């Protein structure tokens, strides 16, 4: 159960309502008028709670659960405890996400501009925005409607935010055009100089970074993540991409739609990713590469070559996943024999 000090629950909802909003089907014999007041994990749920099962590792917890309603895959229905109502979906986690969003909607901010915030006279702030203490909105910046600007945020000169954006405390955004429904978490740094130098024994000469950061709609950027602006071409983050905490994205990088970049990944300059690429935690991707659409990069992989669309790679240097697993098995056998 969510702590009410931090989360405000909506509802209750009937089984019929939850089925409609989740897109799941109701198992036979369930009471469509049954009411539920919250979501909860399998182990903590009670009769008026909704839970879900998406991973077979937790079948035991599912069978022991007291949840009144559970979202599951159809093939798991025969394992349900007696008396539990069921919503059946081929993608239980996604259906549950819709239900959880209904119980915990993201409300519009309470409009307010803190007395200690500073908004330049030439900046434009949309209706219904909340600008918290210490925030700075630079000259010519444009903030869309219903945006939340956290404490001590700095929005630089000329920056554009779309509607319904949230910028977490202490984040900075400069040289950037940001779409709508973008969530930038606390401490993130968007649009600072790319790491560009003409290197030589006589010293390293800084190359002016003259591009921008272009962020699409429905993007999340995690806490303390840094995204450098382009050197001339822009750095681009495609619609619907999800970027975890502590990620470094270099200048001129282009991410397609729906990319998922997990914590501590580093992407060097001018690498291009297609749509729906996934990179596991601490993967390192060198510069000037092409990563095809749908490619998957394992955690801690070191990518030093182009990756074909749909290919899965692992290891350092990264190779096709089957090769990496085979190499790891052979090395393990050799080590055991030697010992």
From Swiss-Prot:
Domain of life where this protein originates: Bacteria
Please give the biological process terms from Gene Ontology that the record holds.
lipid A biosynthetic process
Pathway(s) where this gene product acts: Bacterial outer membrane biogenesis; LPS lipid A biosynthesis
The family database entries (InterPro entries) matched by this protein are listed as: Hexapep (IPR001451), LpxD (IPR007691), Trimer_LpxA-like_sf (IPR011004), UDP_GlcNAc_AcTrfase_non-rep (IPR020573)
Q: Which GO terms describe its cellular component?
A: membrane
The EC number of this protein is 2.3.1.191
Catalyzed reactions: a UDP-3-O-[(3R)-3-hydroxyacyl]-alpha-D-glucosamine + a (3R)-hydroxyacyl-[ACP] = a UDP-2-N,3-O-bis[(3R)-3-hydroxyacyl]-alpha-D-glucosamine + holo-[ACP] + H(+)
User: Top EC class per UniProt?
Assistant: transferase
Among Pfam families, the record links this protein to: Hexapep, LpxD
An example of a GO molecular function for this protein is: N-acyltransferase activity
User: Which PANTHER family does UniProt cross-reference here?
Assistant: UDP-3-O-ACYLGLUCOSAMINE N-ACYLTRANSFERASE, UDP-3-O-ACYLGLUCOSAMINE N-ACYLTRANSFERASE 1, MITOCHONDRIAL-RELATED
Q: Which family does it belong to?
A: Belongs to the transferase hexapeptide repeat family. LpxD subfamily.
Q: How does it assemble?
A: Homotrimer.
Known function: Catalyzes the N-acylation of UDP-3-O-acylglucosamine using 3-hydroxyacyl-ACP as the acyl donor. Is involved in the biosynthesis of lipid A, a phosphorylated glycolipid that anchors the lipopolysaccharide to the outer membrane of the cell.
Give the protein name, as stated in the record.
UDP-3-O-acylglucosamine N-acyltransferase
The scientific name of the source species is Paramagnetospirillum magneticum (strain ATCC 700264 / AMB-1) (Magnetospirillum magneticum)
